[in-house]
Structure formats: structure tokens, C-alpha cells
């Protein structure tokens, strides 16, 4: 099976290329308190061992921002800082990390975004515009009445166009909803109006089982349509499981080849060997 991928601009997050003809990369996010450097680094090493290609950490306060250099020094894969509400944290993180994620729905006035652009430009690192159905701009909620796919796409397009108007194109975009249909529609709408590389995911997908199913359906469909340049499977579980599921989704679509592809009988009364153990 050959999937014709959408043509997107290529950016680099550290040594990982995203978009263009680069393979779809798999990323995850630490579930530790970032201020707990020992626990965070330990989890990062587990993710690296599982093959995770980009790792994001939450930066909710100054204390978390201050320990980013220690965390970065202990890593072999690119580090992404996740910022909400306070653009000053993005300015501090930009001095250390390989990419900064901001949410246009809660970062505040445009002058704050301009300061973030200046900070990431100084180190030639990209920005992720992370739109989320739970934190859309008020005027879009009033316009559409709810966080609809159209509202998500418009939020992302508005942010991208505003950034492009000031000459900033070193970015990737995500449009996340917890409903699979809404997420698919939002990504589809955006993908047909922009060549920005896309980070795909289903937010708040659920526990290990339900989240894996929802993500496999949502991300699998998008990828089968050629949409998606990097992905995260969001699970209320061990982040290592996110990496495993992510690679399995890509393997099932023949977009990545990693590890052994196990083809196993589902078992029935005719089985005379331990299929589960062998698989």
C-alpha cells in the first residue's frame, strides 16, 4: 500500500526533520513534575529506550523553566517546552529547548507572541502552534457556538497567517479535540488550506485501552489520507505506551518499519500451542 503524503514545508526540531519527505516521527510527553529533575530524566531515558524521537515537558512555572538546562543536558533527543498562559516562560524556555509550544487561545495579546517569535528566532528553533478545543479564543466560540472543527481550523489558520505576515514560517501546527470525528474534520480543514507541517493527536484520548483505540482510529485515518508529519498518542498511562502505540499505528500503515511485525492467530479451540506466549 502506498500513501501519498500531503506536501508540507519541512522544519527541524533539533536533529529531527518534520514535514516534507521526512518520515512521520513519534513523540511523547513526560507525566512527571518537571521540577523533579531526577524523576523527569529517568522517564526521558525510558522514552528514549523505547524509541521516542521527540520529548515534551510541561513548563507551568519559573521553577520548571529553571531546571530545563539540567534536563536538556541529560537527553539525546530533542526537547520541547509546553507553555500555557505565561509567555515569559516561553521566553526562558526558548534559551534552552529545541521547540516551544504555545496555545493561541491562552497565550494572550499579540505583542506577547511577537516577543516569543523574537526569542525562538534568536536560536533558530521552531514554534508549535497548539490549538485545543478546550481553550479556544472567545470570539470563535461566540461565532460558532461551540469548539467546532471549523472553529479549531480558523484559530490555527489565523495564528499561522499572523505569524507568516511578520515573516515567521518556522512552525508546525496541531488542532486537538477529544472527539475523534471533530479532530479528523479540523485537521482535514486545515490541511487543505495550509502547507504547514502537522503534529497530529487526539487530546484526552483516555486510558491505555480506550486511548489507544481512539488514537488508532483518528490518527490512522488521517495518516491514510496523507495528513500528519509527527504524532503523539495521548494516553492516561505510562508515556512509554504512547510510543509503542504510535509506532504500531505507523507500522500498520507501512509508514515506518521498526521491530518485528507479529502475525498471530487469534486462537480458538483448534490451537495446540501457546500462541499468546509465542507472539
Predicted regions located by residue number:
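Glycine-rich, proline-tolerant flexible connector loops at the mouths of alpha/beta enzymes
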Residues: 29-37, 48-75, 104-108, 171-180
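Hydrophobic or amphipathic alpha-helical targeting/insertion segments
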Residues: 77, 87-128
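Active-site mouth loops of central-metabolism enzymes
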Residues: 13, 20-39, 58-60, 77-85, ...
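N-terminal amphipathic alpha-helix/helix-capping segment at the start of soluble metabolic enzymes
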Residues: 1-28, 121, 278
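Glycine-rich phosphate-binding active-site loops on the catalytic face of alpha/beta enzymes
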Residues: 51-53, 96-112, 202, 225-239
Amino acid at each position: 500500500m502506498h500513501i501519498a503524503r500531503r506536501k508540507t514545508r519541512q522544519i527541524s526540531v533539533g536533529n529531527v526533520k518534520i514535514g516534507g519527505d521526512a518520515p512521520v516521527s513519534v513523540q511523547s510527553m513526560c507525566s512527571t513534575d518537571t521540577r523533579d529533575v531526577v524523576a523527569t530524566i529517568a522517564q526521558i531515558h525510558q522514552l528514549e529506550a523505547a524509541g521516542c524521537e521527540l520529548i515534551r515537558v510541561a513548563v507551568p512555572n519559573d521553577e520548571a523553566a529553571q531546571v530545563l538546562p539540567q534536563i536538556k543536558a541529560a537527553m539525546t533527543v530533542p526537547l520541547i517546552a509546553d507553555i500555557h498562559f505565561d509567555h515569559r516562560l516561553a521566553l526562558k524556555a526558548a534559551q534552552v529547548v529545541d521547540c516551544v509550544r504555545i496555545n493561541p487561545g491562552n497565550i494572550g495579546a499579540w505583542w506577547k507572541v511577537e516577543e516569543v517569535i523574537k526569542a525562538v528566532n534568536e536560536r533558530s528553533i521552531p514554534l508549535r502552534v497548539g490549538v485545543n478545543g478546550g481553550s479556544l479564543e472567545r470570539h470563535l466560540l461566540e461565532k460558532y457556538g461551540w469548539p467546532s472543527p471549523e472553529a479549531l481550523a480558523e484559530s490555527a489558520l489565523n495564528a499561522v497567517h499572523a505569524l507568516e505576515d511578520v515573516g515567521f514560517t518556522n512552525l508546525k501546527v496541531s488542532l486537538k479535540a477529544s472527539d475523534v470525528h471533530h479532530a479528523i474534520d479540523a485537521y482535514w480543514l486545515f490541511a487543505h488550506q495550509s502547507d504547514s507541517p502537522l503534529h497530529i493527536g487526539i487530546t484526552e484520548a483516555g486510558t491505555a485501552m480506550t486511548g489507544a483505540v481512539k488514537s488508532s482510529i483518528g490518527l490512522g485515518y488521517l495518516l491514510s489520507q496523507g495528513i500528519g508529519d509527527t504524532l503523539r498518542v495521548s494516553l492516561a498511562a505510562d508515556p512509554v505506551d504512547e510510543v509503542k502505540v504510535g509506532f504500531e499505528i505507523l507500522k500498520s500503515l507501512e509508514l515506518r518499519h521498526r521491530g518485528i511485525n507479529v502475525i498471530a492467530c487469534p486462537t480458538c479451540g483448534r490451537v495446540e500451542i501457546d500462541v499468546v506466549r509465542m507472539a
